Amino acid sequence: MTARRTRWTRRTDRSLPIRSAAAAVAFAAGATACSAPTGGGGDGGTEAAESVVIGVASEPDTLSPLLGYGKDGNSKIFDGLLARDTDLELKPALAAALPKVTDDGRTITFTLREGVNFSDGEPLTAGDVYTYRTVLDEKTNNTARSELDAVRERSARADGTVVFTLKYPYAPFAARTVLPIVPEHVAGKQDPNTGDFNTEPVGTGPYVLTGWSKGEKLGFRANPHYWGDKPAVKSFTMAVTADDNVRATRLRSGDLDGAVLPPNLAATFEKDDGRRTYRARSYDFRAVTLPSAGQVTGDRAIRRALDAAVDRQAMVDKILDGAGRPAYGPLPVDDPWYERGIERPRDLAAAGRILDEAGWKPGSGGIRARDGQRASFTLYYPSGDKVRQDHALAYASDAKKAGIEVKVEGATWEVIEPRMKTDAVLADLGSVGDPDFGLYTLLHSTLAGDGFNNMAHYANPAVDEALDAGRRSQDPKVRAAAYREIQKALVADPGYTFLTHIDHLYVLADRWDGLTTQLEGRTNTASPAGPGGTSRTGGRKK
């Protein structure tokens, strides 16, 4: 890795503003691609440390970028035209240089890097950028298609030049070109939805897949054809362990070299001389989806009352042990696009007034009701996710004090997904980079129910208009005004209850010296799984 190395802070130190949107992926990428194992570590010394086993919570549905895998530049199997360095700045990857922008932002021209081969030994060509055409094809099952809405056409030239023509100027388009490029000579001969490429990928990245035991592990080794600096780690395994407690037990037993853990479990390793705990800030936030179709969750007064009743700071202090920040919206408080002044402390009195004025009156057991309808709904969280479980229980406790009953249930995603239209979910969301990347898919009414986009089925014409303005304008002042309006609208008309922005805690065997950041930067991708992928088809995150 040629980017500047920035040490991840020990949890006991002052944390750096490192932003990563998928904890396990960033952790694995940093440990494998950028760390140098020392000879004084565990049994076996340097030789043993050249391979590593990382515990992750879940696995991807696919390893194909055509269906959303690694779409935010986080993959270790693939590369995009551009990549991000540790400071979030764009840098050339498969492109030889940053693009040339002409025609008032409507024409974007790239020149490919020479001498790049795929892991099967075949050379990269401009024709391989067909990736974009396939993603945009409505027959391709990729719910991230809206992220490339600005693209009118893509053309490839024999001299290695790739030209994108846009429908309208799209200020953050260059950042979209971190999308991984796949080989047309392999993937182009298959059905993108069902072909073998989904489980047998061929890419240009530093690693190649060696095996995938569904539900158990994914194995990787260094790509001998890789065009960049060779990774220090020759092979690694992503061990899929959904339950946080089991993952911690496996780490303690030595079965894992590292893992992403919630604060309460990471704290149990702080005095372990053989391991280090690292902390990194992120864009990840926890929020409760409040579906518009729900009889209770769709009521605006209920939504506003819940927003007023929740004690965000207590969640940061008690659930995250201080490793996070209150979330007053989808953007973290230290983001340059964040709208200062929308902060709001817990106010149970205000919650009561809102419900009284809307006709929700106290009833049996202190739970409010209106026209025979109790203010009660179910809140799902994925079983085994300790952080989300704790958030859900705290949320239910806060809601009850306002007279709203929240019934918390843990379940598998097979159970949760069919219920998302009408039942609340403790969601794990977040987006690094331009605000368009996360806000559009989170809030635009045209994406309601599209996979894991707009899970609340939120619909606000003024917000839609502002989202479109922010996406289509290149004027920084116009864009800033649009995103200010959106954040204020979410206070007056919430579709989600935003709870916390979390810091990621990583526990790693001490023999890994020089751990560095490796940005993963996904937008609304799924719970982290695999080296830079999304856990669910289409770049969706729950």
Swiss-Prot record:
One of its GO terms (cellular component) is ATP-binding cassette (ABC) transporter complex. It is a lipid-anchor. It comes from the Bacteria. It is found in: Cell membrane. Residues 1-33 form the signal peptide. Keywords: Cell membrane, Lipoprotein, Membrane, Palmitate, Signal, Transport. GO terms for biological process: peptide transport. Residues 519-542 are annotated as: Disordered. The keyword Lipoprotein applies. The keyword Cell inner membrane does not apply. GO terms for molecular function: peptide transmembrane transporter activity. A lipid is attached at residue 34 (S-diacylglycerol cysteine). Pfam families: SBP_bac_5. A lipid is attached at residue 34 (N-palmitoyl cysteine). Belongs to the bacterial solute-binding protein 5 family. Required for transport of an unidentified substrate. PANTHER family: OLIGOPEPTIDE-BINDING PROTEIN APPA (PTHR30290:SF9), PERIPLASMIC BINDING COMPONENT OF ABC TRANSPORTER (PTHR30290). This is Protein XP55. It comes from Streptomyces lividans. The gene is xp55.
